[in-house]
């Protein structure tokens, strides 16, 4: 996401995975039973499916096997409510293959398992194929899905926030990580393509991603769902032989697919460093995020999104450090009391595990 300080972000396009010719055999006979996912029900997503897929410019990631295919179909159909065209954009599979797989695994919009009322917030990897932003998409071309996860609202199972953890990391050398393409990074300037990764399950309710950069620096992201919040961590490890400074991080919470929060304005936002909150159109609900070490609390109206962007301390060779973050939902009209309640949880000291 482009910062208003004049610095902008980019990402090197990863290698395109080739769709295996064996998928037709693996998926079995094509079924013409008329099974297809429901149309997208995300807030503000009034664009035609074809336009949405075009704008996303996603690099498809074919499933690695049947288990992977089934997990992604459940993710995309049961929860994100993707259309067949959007699943094609995410996976590279042909529409007929997708329909056949839906029939084989019996994954339909109307047979999603019910969740218990006391379940943790639903936290899922974001599948790609549908752009997570409503606007300013030219500032996030070919978004990489491996740093993005969806958190579904407790009041509407079809609405979700997409968190990019991290969207970007700067150092004194420039941009060392970017989760999409926009402007050159230190790696694209050298012609280096970073490998494609995926979120890994971290316990029953968590996700984890570890990436090592070509210079020996590594970062690890964690997100864990509880009933009241998503607790997050970002760890920075300096495995290089030089010190790093000016380690600024962008962590983006995109609201365009959360009903009632998709207005492209900052008039519905509240900034109380480190807390950034967005009010729903009816004024009765809030989405709240915060990070320790916040050096800039802001929002980008066209996206729309929330930022509580932190900064790591300077990093000597061999050192490591971590920052903790928070995302939650609130129903009520006393934001001050809710922020005080969140502060009292001592979330900065609680590990995301």
Briefly describe each language-model feature range.
Residues 109-126:
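Short Lys/Arg-enriched helix C-cap and helix-to-coil transition segments
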Residues 66-81:
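Short, amphipathic alpha-helical "recognition" segments used to contact nucleic acids or chromatin
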